[in-house]
Amino acid sequence: MSLSTHYHAHKPNVPIIMEDVFGWVREGNAFQVRVWLDDHEHDLNVGDDHAFSLLHWAAKGGHVAIAEMLLSRGARVNSTNMGDDTSLHLAAAHGHRQIVVKLLSRKADVNATNEHGMTPLHYACFWGYEQIAEDLISCGAAVNVCNKKGMTPLDVCQPMCKNTILEIAQEHGQSPNDRVPFKDTTWKGTKSRTRDATLSRYTGVDVSSLNLITKIAESHSGELWRGKWQGNDIVARILNVQEVTARISRDFQTEFPALRIFAHPNICAVLAAANQPPNLVIISQYMPFGSLYNVLHEQSSVVIDHGQAVRFALDIARGMSYLHSLDPMLLRFYLSSKHVVVDEELTAKLSMADTKFSFQEVGKAYSPAWMSPEALSRAPEDLNIRAADMWSFAILLWELNTREVPFSDLPPMECGMKIALEGLRVHIPPGIARNMNRLMNICMNEDPGRRPNFDQIIPILERMIL
């Protein structure tokens, strides 16, 4: 019997493997943590009974190597525990400067407040961590924000470093006398709790446990609903299958676990599924900005300049590189802006919930504009999937740089036929940067064997950001 099938007597719903990983992080056992993370079904953003994430414990314990490992694999920097502490609160309060610096470099919210109204700077000042206070102030931490008791970081500061911290604040243009009263923002729902561990432990769920609130969309694939499950915001996809036979139900049960990929920051995993014919439901985390297609082409508050466009492209390339490293590979994830989601930190993630099952839409292509000529004329089993995905990525690059929908003037069938048989291609307009123009052309090489792989283009995109 495997470890994952043993359960604690005092917590019958908590597998030993989950309990162990929190212990390994607290102990600083980097080797065991790495082994646990290498299983892509393990969700590194889960919380324990008090909603402490693995990153919370690494930050509190000062385990730099583990913190680096978690951050590199997509740990959510601004997740909060039950007391509304972020990992930055804990690192600052316990004097772990290396981790503070790493969290700040990952866009940690420097002025986040916990249930007491305390910011990370409050704790750095209270414990006299002068260098950490300077790091925080340099990144925008405010010295004049009051906690629930009306006290600023300088009010609670250790006398020995108060004058130094005051000078640092003044050098950064802050006026400590302009006190900012405490404002309770918890009602706004802006805080991001760690995921309940049950979200990544459950694979099969009962449809009746889903509270589906609002229908977001309906298409040939099925219905998309926003709702709640276990108190968490989720999106449920109810698949459109004419008749759910015993074989289809069995195939669904066999195929969906491969979509539970938690091990990469640029992949949005399937959390669970409900297999209750006639209902087949896929459950994933709700993303506030929706799909990249929505961000680019529909009403969205996101401002996309050239730098943000390249960052989106880099996120997508990193996610695709990881997918291409899997053995066996996913056969039916069709890359397009409709199948990429954007989280609250403007990180692009490949949506595993948009992967097609073997029984879905067989022989049909509803978004051919992003597909390579060979993908439109061959079955996935007979295709060089890596090369076909690179063509799709080139169309995404074109879309990010032009802000246009490819072949929007053509119906899908005509578009697909012309791409496959008549040489229809996107036109790269003048004004696109020369290096981006060249990258698009390389990725869209007519010879699939001459297209690069994602590991080769990631360094190119990284240089474009610098």
From Swiss-Prot:
Keywords: ANK repeat, Cell adhesion, Cell membrane, Cytoplasm, Membrane, Repeat. The keyword Membrane applies. Its main location: cytoplasm. GO terms for molecular function: ATP binding; integrin binding; protein serine/threonine kinase activity; protein-macromolecule adaptor activity; signaling receptor binding. Disruption phenotype: Embryonic lethality due to 1.5 fold stage-onset paralysis. Mutant embryos have defects in maintaining polarization of several components involved in the assembly of dense bodies and M lines, such as integrin pat-3, unc-89 and unc-112 to muscle attachment sites. RNAi-mediated knockdown causes sterility resulting from oocyte accumulation in the proximal gonad and distal tip cell (DTC) migration defects (33 percent of animals). Actin cytoskeleton in the proximal gonad appears disorganized. Residues 210-465 form the Protein kinase domain. GO terms for cellular component: adherens junction; basal plasma membrane; cytoplasm; focal adhesion; integrin complex; M band; striated muscle dense body. ANK repeats lie at residues 50-79, 83-112, 116-145. The keyword Cytoplasm applies. It is a peripheral membrane protein. InterPro entries: Ankyrin_rpt, Ankyrin_rpt-contain_sf, Kinase-like_dom_sf, PK_ILK, Prot_kinase_dom, Ser-Thr/Tyr_kinase_cat_dom, Ser/Thr_Kinases-Pseudokinases. One of its GO terms (biological process) is muscle cell cellular homeostasis. Pfam families: Ank, Ank_2, PK_Tyr_Ser-Thr. It is found in: Cytoplasm, Myofibril, Sarcomere, M line; Basal cell membrane. Expressed in body wall muscle. SMART domains: ANK (SM00248). The protein kinase domain is predicted to be catalytically inactive. Belongs to the protein kinase superfamily. TKL Ser/Thr protein kinase family. Interacts (via protein kinase domain) with unc-112 (via N-terminus). Interacts (via ANK repeats) with unc-97 (via first LIM domain). Interacts (via protein kinase domain) with pat-6 (via C-terminus CH domain). May form a complex with unc-112, unc-97 and pat-6. Does not interact with integrin pat-3. Component of an integrin containing attachment complex, composed of at least pat-2, pat-3, pat-4, pat-6, unc-52, unc-97 and unc-112. Probable pseudokinase that acts as an adapter protein. Component of an integrin containing attachment complex, which is required for muscle development and maintenance. Involved in the assembly of dense bodies and M lines during body wall muscle development by recruiting several of their components including integrin pat-3, cpna-1, unc-89 and unc-112 to integrin-mediated attachment sites. Plays a role in distal tip cell (DTC) migration and in oocyte development probably by regulating the actin cytoskeleton. This is Integrin-linked protein kinase homolog pat-4. It comes from Caenorhabditis elegans. The lineage of its organism: Eukaryota, Metazoa, Ecdysozoa, Nematoda, Chromadorea. The gene is pat-4.
